[in-house]
Structures are given as structure tokens and as C-alpha cells.
């Protein structure tokens, strides 16, 4: 562990490293009675850049660092997607807003023209992958298999999307082509959750271990064997099985040399 960022808060989840690595966007609360909101951590300070009352979560920086996509839960209990200037100025841009199904966990394309996300049906708990045009709001389905497809992340070159799915009986990490799911590859070998890309590796959690997978993209997607990077216990995240949660507790920078993790501290 090289250091810490931001003050101690009651709860912090969903960390997202800014493209220049100077800041971290998080879903956090200062006090036990608060709801989760979007905060920007820089140095040892924390700045809330929104004024919404509903739960805010699943923050991610745009490729140029000027905007942040995130979800807000409305009064009816449904989560929709919005875009906010990362300096807190102006108002939220509606990315996709409708009743019925949650829209969670956005992921920008490298040119910031589209955002991939997963839907959640509150009645069936089914989750599918969609994407939306930032300019027009037009949506399309990417993956809608049986069961759960969730926590998608677009690769740094925009050609692939990694996600987790229970199509084989337990959560595993898969990669599909983007913007059309024409081919798919299984990456994990013993379960997986929370996929994240660097330029030349795909990372995910297997139980309490962070795994890294090198890959080649000539003629498709060809992953190497997963290698253990470190454990949650080694990084101060505790001994929990990370696969039991839909709330990512880490992020990685573009060159894959630095990670931000959420440490669990005694109260």
C-alpha cells in the first residue's frame, strides 16, 4: 500500500480513477444516517459535486475527465443514468430515464459517444447489457442471455466489453465484441467478478484474489491464463469473498501499475 486518498468517511464504494490519476470519484457517505452520493476525492479532501436527494452510485469518468456518468435512484425506487460535469458546474444531463427497470453501472466508450450499462428487472432480478448514445439517447441491446449479465466495462480501445455472467452456473468473466456481440470468450477459470481493463490486461476478482489476464487482439480476443496479483487481505480490504457483492471496491489506472482499493477499517 503506497498511500491513501481522501478523508475517512462512514462508507466508500465504486471508486473510479480520473484519467490523469489525480482524483478519485466515489459513492460515499460521511455519516451513518446519510444516503450515498457522488464525491470527488483529491489529496486528503472530499468534495460532493451533486445536490440530488436520491441514492447515487456507479460513478465513472469520461475519457477526457470532463464528465462523470452515474446512476441516481428516483422517488419511485428506480435508478436511471445521468452525466455530470466533473467540476460540479451546471445541471445533470439525462442519459437514460424511464420507469420499470434499473439502469446501473455505466461504462464510456473511448470516444465518449456511447455508454454501456446493465439493466436490472426488480421482479425477476434478471440483468442484461445495453448501450446508449450520449448524443441522442437511443438505446440498443448488447447481451440479453438468460440469467445475469452485469458490471460491464468497455476496453480501452473500444473493441470489446468485459462483463460477469452466471450462464455457466456461477459468476464468471466473459468478453464480447462491441458494438455487436458477435463473438464471446470466457476469461476466468474459477469464478469472477468486477472486471476492469488496463491497456494490456483485464483484471477481476476471484474470491479474495485480484487476478490479471494478459490478452492479444489479433484476429479476435485471446486471453492468457489468469495470474494472481494480490489478495484483499494484503491490500487491507479484509478476507471477504468479493464475488458476493455487486459493489466494486477497486479500480486500476490505464497502464495497470496502480490500483485504488477500499479498505475496511475498525469503527
Predicted regions and their residues:
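Short loop/turn segments that connect beta-strands within beta-propeller blades
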Residues: 41-45, 85-89, 133-137, 177-181, ...
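Short, intrinsically disordered, charge-balanced linker/junction segments flanking boundaries
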Residues: 1-2, 40-42, 197-199, 265-267
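Predominantly a core beta-strand signature of beta-propeller blades
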Residues: 2-3, 45-48, 89-93, 137-141, ...
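Structural motif
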Residues: 33-39, 76-82, 124-130, 169-175, ...
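Active-site/binding-pocket entry motifs
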Residues: 30-32, 75, 121-123, 234-236, ...
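Acidic, glycine-rich loop-and-beta core segments that form the ion-binding/anion-interacting portion
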Residues: 108, 116, 127-134
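Conserved beta-propeller blade repeats
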Residues: 7-27, 51-73, 93, 97-119, ...
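C-terminal structured "cap/appendage" subdomains that terminate the fold
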Residues: 201-266
Amino acid at each position: 500500500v503506497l498511500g491513501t486518498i481522501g478523508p475517512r468517511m462512514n462508507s466508500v464504494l465504486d471508486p473510479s480513477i480520473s484519467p490523469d490519476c489525480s482524483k478519485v470519484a466515489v459513492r460515499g457517505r460521511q455519516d451513518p444516517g446519510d444516503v450515498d452520493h457522488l464525491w470527488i476525492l483529491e489529496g486528503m479532501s472530499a468534495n460532493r459535486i451533486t445536490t440530488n436527494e436520491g441514492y447515487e452510485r456507479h460513478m465513472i469518468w469520461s475519457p477526457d475527465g470532463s464528465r462523470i456518468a452515474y446512476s441516481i435512484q428516483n422517488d419511485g425506487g428506480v435508478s436511471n443514468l445521468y452525466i455530470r460535469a466533473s467540476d460540479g458546474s451546471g445541471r445533470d444531463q439525462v442519459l437514460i430515464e424511464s420507469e420499470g427497470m434499473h439502469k446501473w453501472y455505466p461504462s464510456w466508450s473511448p470516444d465518449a459517444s456511447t455508454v454501456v450499462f446493465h439493466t436490472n428487472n426488480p421482479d425477476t432480478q434478471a440483468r442484461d447489457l445495453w448501450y446508449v448514445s450520449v448524443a441522442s439517447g437511443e438505446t440498443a441491446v448488447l447481451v440479453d442471455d438468460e440469467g445475469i449479465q452485469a458490471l460491464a466495462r468497455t476496453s480501452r480501445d473500444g473493441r470489446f466489453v468485459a462483463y460477469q455472467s452466471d450462464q455457466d452456473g456461477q459468476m464468471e468473466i466473459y468478453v464480447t465484441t462491441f458494438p455487436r456481440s458477435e463473438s464471446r470468450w470466457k476469461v476466468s477459470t474459477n469464478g469472477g467478478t468486477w472486471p476492469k481493463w488496463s491497456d494490456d490486461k483485464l483484471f477481476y476478482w476471484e474470491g479474495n484474489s485480484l487476478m490479471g489476464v494478459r490478452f492479444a487482439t489479433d484476429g479476435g480476443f485471446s486471453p492468457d491464463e489468469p495470474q494472481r496479483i494480490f489478495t484483499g487481505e494484503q491490500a487491507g480490504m479484509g478476507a471477504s469473498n468479493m464475488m458476493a457483492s455487486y459493489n466494486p471496491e477497486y479500480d486500476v489506472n490505464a497502464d495497470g501499475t496502480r490500483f485504488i482499493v477500499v479498505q475496511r477499517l475498525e469503527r
